[in-house]
């Protein structure tokens, strides 16, 4: 790009950001440290590809891990180039659902299939094995989801990696049989089933690759094995593939994230260009130095050194305390000192690792006369009334959705007991009927 002819939307980018946006090779790994402007880079790159008339918006696929991030990515790209509204910018799971509904016949599914979340999966386990406790059902649902993250089927020889429980293979197999018989899928299927279909069906694979000539992935360090396999099938030899991530921020191993996906990216995808974003616009240097002093001991990392653009800043303090009560008292002391020095309560945020830890603060803070507000205790879609309404809608769209049917069949109360409910489900299953029609026929008889 000739100096002096830079478009307005590229102004303000630092040299590394500009290089990442304008790079035209087929394989690009952007190592973006915290606070280095990666969201601006990836959204500007989407708009830049369209503005330069290299690609149609419809040929661009951008995936990330949360709806909030996907919405922000879309809005910021559209602010630069409105036609980016036509690009496919979604979460991995949302893209998987989009892909499966458009290829439903290839999956032997109806396009109106229901998608089971973690609670639904646990309920399905319980419907198959009613003697299991609620906790056991949740544990098995979690293990099944984990198996799918690692692309392991019930007959996989490596399933012991997930669980050595002698009954797990049978439970997983029964769960899959029931899920398929009802024509529904769970969250893990939204990644695994498209990946497996694209691997075996050359026609659909080629058609999909022709559709999506550009693939961008945000927060790549959080990707799991199934998502990696899906990405391998989506990106053809001539596709432009750009992933953005930070191997130093890979903290979701317990959810199945595989840091090797980003560490091995240059080995798996030949001729990869690596661009490092190391200018931090968020934190002071003291915080960056503290973080670096810890993460530098990781043996397997691609490496980068963050430099703060903000001057000054206080050094972080680390306190070693004996128990949670002492931690809470320490936080209370710091908070009261801040207010005593003419600060405000609203200036203070306290982060804790698990929701259960909030109980200690709720118990002790009133004793210290400290006002507080807990943020994000219950997610909108986890509220009972919201899940009930979604279940009613799911039944309208897919009358074979057993889990949604069981959730709302007695809301409001209709006097349908467990025995009657089992009879409806069994009658539907053995006669190839949906649950609404099965109910009608049983009532008529």
Mark where each language-model region is.
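Conserved SAM-binding loop
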Residues: 42, 62, 89, 243-244, ...
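A basic/glycine-biased coupling hinge at the interface between accessory DNA-binding modules
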Residues: 2-8, 25-28, 33-36, 47-214, ...
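Pre-Walker A adenine-sensing motif
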Residues: 11-22
């Amino acid at each position: 790009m000739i100096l002096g002819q830079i478009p307005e939307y590229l102004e303000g980018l630092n040299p590394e950001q500009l290089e990442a946006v304008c790079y035209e090779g087929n394989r690009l790994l952007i190592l973006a440290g915290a606070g280095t402007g990666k969201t601006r880079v990836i959204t500007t790159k989407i708009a830049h590809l369209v503005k330069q008339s290299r690609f149609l918006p419809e040929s661009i696929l951008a995936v990330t891990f949360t709806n909030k991030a996907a919405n922000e990515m879309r809005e910021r790209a559209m602010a630069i180039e409105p036609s980016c509204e036509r690009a496919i910018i979604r979460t991995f799971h949302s893209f998987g659902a989009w892909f499966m509904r458009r290829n439903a016949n290839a999956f032997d599914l109806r396009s109106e299939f229901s998608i089971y979340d973690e609670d639904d999966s646990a309920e399905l386990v319980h419907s198959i094995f009613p003697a299991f406790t609620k906790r056991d059902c949740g544990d098995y649902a979690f293990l099944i989801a984990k198996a799918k993250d690692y692309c392991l089927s019930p007959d996989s020889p490596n399933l012991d990696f997930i669980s050595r429980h002698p009954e797990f293979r049978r439970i997983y197999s029964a769960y899959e049989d029931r899920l398929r018989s009802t024509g529904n899928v769970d969250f893990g299927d939204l990644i695994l089933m498209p990946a497996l279909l694209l691997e075996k069906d050359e026609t659909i694979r080629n058609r999909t690759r022709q559709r999506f000539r550009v693939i961008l992935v945000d927060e790549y360090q959080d990707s799991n094995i199934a998502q990696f396999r899906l990405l391998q099938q989506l990106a053809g030899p001539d596709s432009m593939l750009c992933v953005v991530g930070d191997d130093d921020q890979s903290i979701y191993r317990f959810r199945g994230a595989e840091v090797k996906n980003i560490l091995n990216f240059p080995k798996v995808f030949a001729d990869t260009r690596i661009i490092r974003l190391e200018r931090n616009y968020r934190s002071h240097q003291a915080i960056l130095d503290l973080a670096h002093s810890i993460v530098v001991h990781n043996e397997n990392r691609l490496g980068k050194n963050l430099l703060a653009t903000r001057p000054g800043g206080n050094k972080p303090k680390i306190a070693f305390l004996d128990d949670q009560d002492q931690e809470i008292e320490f936080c209370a002391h710091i908070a009261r000192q801040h207010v005593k020095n003419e600060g405000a309560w609203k200036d203070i945020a306290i982060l804790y690792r698990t929701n259960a830890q909030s109980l200690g603060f709720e118990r002790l803070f009133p004793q210290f006369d400290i006002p507080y507000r807990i943020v994000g205790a219950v997610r909108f879609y986890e509220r009972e009334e919201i899940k009930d309404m979604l279940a009613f809608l799911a039944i309208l769209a897919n009358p074979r959705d057993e889990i949604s049917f069981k959730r709302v069949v007695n809301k409001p109360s209709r006097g349908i007991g467990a025995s009657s409910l089992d009879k409806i489900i069994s009658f539907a299953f053995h006669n190839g009927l949906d649950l609404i029609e099965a109910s009608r026929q049983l009532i008529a008889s």
